[in-house]
Design a protein with these regions (language model features):
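Short acidic/polar hinge/loop motifs at secondary-structure boundaries
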Residues: 103-136
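Periplasmic-side early beta-strands and strand-to-turn transitions of outer-membrane beta-barrels
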Residues: 161-279, 487
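Face-selective signature of the C-terminal outer-membrane beta-barrel domain
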Residues: 233-251, 274-398, 402-410, 474-481, ...
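Outer membrane beta-barrel strand-and-loop segments of large Gram-negative receptors
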Residues: 321-325, 338, 362, 368-370, ...
Length: 632
């Protein structure tokens, strides 16, 4: 069934102990994700976009996913609670999420890509975010597995331990024009300040959110989120900094027959009433971070324990990570050296293979060493070379290199480009011959069997960018990119009928049996362009366009597109600060028709093109109250 388009009305009210809202002065943006240390964005050896705190406040975004819609090369797939994020034609599982440089790795508790969008619910509330850095293209040489498509690093506000306590409270409501669509209500809060002046500080964050269930079959389910976090910051001296973090997030997703879920399921002439579906996801993280800033040497180390629970499917994962990264400043060279150790454990009572004799736990260790050198060969040209070695318990050793150059041709022109390798290790279930994962969507009795002979997926990407900035009120850029993808892990049907002897495993006959294999090669390529114009002191216009295409180079569907991506994407936004207290904004997001795509074992049809237009305003009622409203 086609879900009708809807028009949204959003009202947000925020209160904070802060200075009056004004546009920040133009200044060089500083980023850290491309190299691990601070540098100006025009010098960063990567294609990188930044969503600043000011932009987040101006546009009344609902969450991180909403903010990412305006970034070139980024596609937000799905909708409602099931939004997922893809970069440069790579599927969402190849996008690595970081929070303050630390991994968010939870996909093992939603196998077969069920309930997509879960990872976005683990990200910090907008009130606590300082900026969001988005790297388009592989960064496996620095961050390892999963960073094949790109990296999204959410950087939160620093703890204040020398100033008075400050905070903000933000509440918003979204009312649907179509009364059959669920309304959205959300509140998030942030506070930070000293516990012991100059020595110990703290910050706390919280989020409450609910999206009501649609009264439309195959519409959006009900989603409820409750998030909370606390950070203690200890600064014994000006050179050392310690953070102790704890965060706990809960998500509930509910579907009711006759509302977002069909009242019954029919197989042939037999129909069975559906039951209500209730899913809960729980995520808890603990981490300890040390940062040291010395004369010619900086260091950052952290240890993190991440626990994710899917109680409805009796799945629980544990990811323990220790990471160390150091920068050594040697004249024209900035040397980055580091290492990482990860231990993954998955408990899942859903193993379907009787021959596995009750196997319900999978584990894996891996460690890595990495090095990069940023060499300022001349005043205008910098070359960055990096290499990472990953050692995996199941897959041995993998080497991931990258090389990138930044050339400031003239005062207003910059040429950037490089070659980067990408790497992604198979999931725990995918690599175990003793694991059979249930599948079939509740309509068919199917199973996917793991394969210990799988190889890691790999990619090789090239990009070339030309950027122009008149250092006043105009900027523009164009980037060409190409990615060759090999050893893609895909699902191949062993049999398709319970009458087929091949579909009988351990005395049980399945409707179908699938195997995991490395078969596919693919290519993704495209163009990203951007333009910005500060028309007057109070009026600003930005626009970007992305062209992306993909092609499978081998396998049954050679010559067909790989992923469900629009070839054409266009985003534009106009901001007007009418008075010191009143501002208006508008944005347009156009997505072309998506190509047909490989959906597990067959090609599926794409979706039609669409255009979204949003307009809004912001009003500073007083120094502590900001009111925003919009029509989406």
């Amino acid at each position: 069934m086609t879900i009708p388009r809807i028009k949204l009305l959003a009202v947000a009210i925020g209160a904070a102990t802060c200075s009056p809202f004004v546009h920040a002065a133009d200044q060089d943006t500083v980023v850290v994700t491309a190299t691990g240390f601070e540098q100006k964005i025009q010098n960063a050896p990567a294609s990188i976009s930044v969503i600043s705190k000011q932009q987040i406040e101006d546009k009344a975004y609902r969450d991180v996913t909403d903010a990412l819609r305006d970034v070139p090369g980024v596609v937000v797939t799905g909708g409602g609670s099931s939004s997922d994020i893809s970069i440069r034609g790579m599927a969402s599982q190849y996008t690595l999420f970081l929070v303050n440089g630390k991994r968010v790795s939870t996909r093992s508790t939603r196998p077969n890509s069920d309930n997509s969008g879960i990872e976005q619910g683990w990200l910090p509330p907008l009130e606590s975010i300082e900026r969001i850095e988005v790297i388009r293209g592989p960064m496996s040489s620095l961050y390892g597995s999963d960073a094949m498509g790109g990296v999204i690093n959410v950087i939160t506000k620093k703890v204040s331990n020398t100033k008075a306590w400050t905070g903000s409270l933000h509440g918003d409501a979204t009312f649907q024009e179509n009364h059959d669509s669920g309304d959205i209500f959300q509140t998030n809060a942030y506070a930070s300040g000293p516990l012991i002046d100059g020595l110990l500080g703290a910050k706390v964050t919280g989020l409450l959110s609910r999206r009501a269930e649609d009264k439309i079959v195959n519409g959006y389910n009900e989603q409820k989120m409750r998030n909370g976090g606390i950070t203690l910051n200890f600064t014994p001296d000006e050179k050392n900094d310690f953070d102790l973090d704890f965060a706990r997030e809960l998500q509930d997703r509910n579907s009711t027959p006759g509302m977002s879920k069909a009242a019954e399921t029919c197989r042939g002439t037999t129909c069975t009433p559906n039951t209500k579906s209730d899913s809960r996801y729980e995520h808890t993280t603990y981490s300890l971070t040390h940062s040291g800033y010395y004369e010619d040497f900086n260091t950052t180390s952290y240890i993190q324990q991440e626990e994710t629970n899917n109680p409805g499917r009796e799945m629980r994962s544990y990811n323990t990570t220790f990471n160390n990264q150091n920068q050594i400043f040697l004249g024209d060279h900035t040397l980055t050296l580091g290492g990482q150790y990860r231990y993954e454990k998955l408990r899942d009572n859903g193993n379907q293979l009787e021959a596995a004799d009750g196997l319900n736990k999978l584990t894996r260790w891996s460690w890595a060493l990495f090095a990069e050198d940023e060499w300022s060969m001349t005043e205008s040209f910098t070359l960055t070379g990096g290499l990472r070695m990953d050692k995996d318990q199941n897959y041995g050793t993998n080497w991931t290199p990258r090389g990138y150059g930044v050339w400031h041709l003239a005062d207003q022109w910059t040429l950037k480009g490089g070659v980067s390798a990408g790497y992604r290790a198979p999931d725990l279930r995918q690599s175990s011959a003793s694991w059979g994962q249930v599948t079939g969507g509740g309509r068919l009795d199917g199973i996917i069997v793991g394969n210990p002979d799988l190889k890691p997926e790999k990619s090789l990407s090239e990009e070339l960018a030309l950027l122009w900035d008149n250092n006043d009120n105009l900027n523009a850029g164009v980037t060409l990119f190409n990615t060759d993808f090999k050893d893609k892990i895909t699902e191949v049907r062993r049999c398709n009928s319970s009458a087929d002897p091949a579909c009988t495993i351990g005395g049980h006959s399945y409707d179908f049996v699938s195997d995991r294999v490395n078969v596919d090669k693919a290519n993704m390529r495209g163009v990203e362009s951007s333009f910005g114009w500060k028309i007057t002191r109070d009026v600003n216009w930005t626009a970007n366009y992305t062209y992306t295409e993909s092609e499978q180079k081998s396998g049954q569907f050679s010559g067909k597109p790989l992923n469900k991506m629009p070839k054409h994407m266009f985003n534009t936004a106009l901001d007007w600060q009418a008075t010191p207290d009143v501002g208006f904004w508008s944005r347009l997001n156009l997505r072309g028709k998506t190509s047909e795509y490989l959906s597990r074992t067959s090609m599926s049809q794409g979706t039609p093109s669409y255009t979204q237009v949003d307009v809004g305003m912001r009003y500073n009622a007083n120094k502590n109250l900001l009111v925003t409203a919009g029509v989406y």
